[in-house]
Regions:
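Bacterial Sec-dependent N-terminal signal peptides
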Residues: 16-41, 139-151
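Sec-dependent bacterial lipoprotein signal peptides
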Residues: 1-22
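Short hydrophobic/aromatic-rich beta-strand segments that constitute the beta-sheet cores
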Residues: 39, 63-72, 98-102, 119-127
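Acidic, glycine-rich flexible loop segments
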Residues: 95-118
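N-terminal glycine/threonine-rich, aromatic-flanked beta-hairpin/loop signature
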Residues: 48-97
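Post-signal peptide N-terminal segment of mature Sec-exported envelope proteins
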Residues: 32-52, 56
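Short, solvent-exposed aromatic-acidic interface loops
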Residues: 44-45, 69-78, 103-107, 126-130
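Edge beta-strand at a domain terminus
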Residues: 82-97, 120, 124-151
């Protein structure tokens, strides 16, 4: 009986360590994601392909979520006289997936099956309309005045 109790205790400890590791992974992802990223998200609006995107992730202290901005740049003055479409975003890391709500468009996207490092962020993005695309972003240290955009 003592051997069974010991095995049961060890199984419980192993199970608990796995569940805590999952939370730590999400926290680490949110921490690394924090900042500005630029590159090609392969975004299409209408029949126009974005040239590149800039995404800013601002992490809430100690949480797996935050707010930010997502700007898609297009060739020419495509959108209401601008060469970009700007969105405020909210985001959450849950079970290693990154869930993003584009507040100004009222759309949701999910980033999954990705590689995230200090300088490069690549993987797949799935929009709520069923479109799936590979993306590749790089850490951007430029300073942006986010208030200059038409929201």
């Amino acid at each position: 009986m003592k051997k069974f109790t010991t095995l049961l205790t060890m199984a419980f400890i192993a199970l608990m360590s796995i569940s805590f590791t999952s939370c730590d992974d999400d926290s680490d992802i949110a921490y690394t994601l924090d900042g500005t990223w630029e590159g090609n998200m392969l975004v299409e609006y209408g029949n126009h392909n974005a040239l590149y995107s800039v995404i800013r992730f601002d992490q809430n202290d100690g949480f797996y979520s935050g707010t930010g901005y997502w700007i898609d740049y297009y060739k020419g003055n495509y959108w209401h006289g601008n060469n970009y479409i700007a969105n405020h975003i909210t985001w959450t890391v849950r079970n290693r997936n990154i869930y993003i709500t584009l507040l100004d468009e009222g759309r949701d996207v999910v980033i999954y099956d990705y590689a995230l490092g200090d300088r490069k962020f690549s993987g797949y993005v799935d929009a709520d309309n069923g479109n799936r695309a590979y993306f590749e972003l790089y850490r951007d240290y430029d300073s942006y005045n986010w208030r200059d955009y038409d929201w």
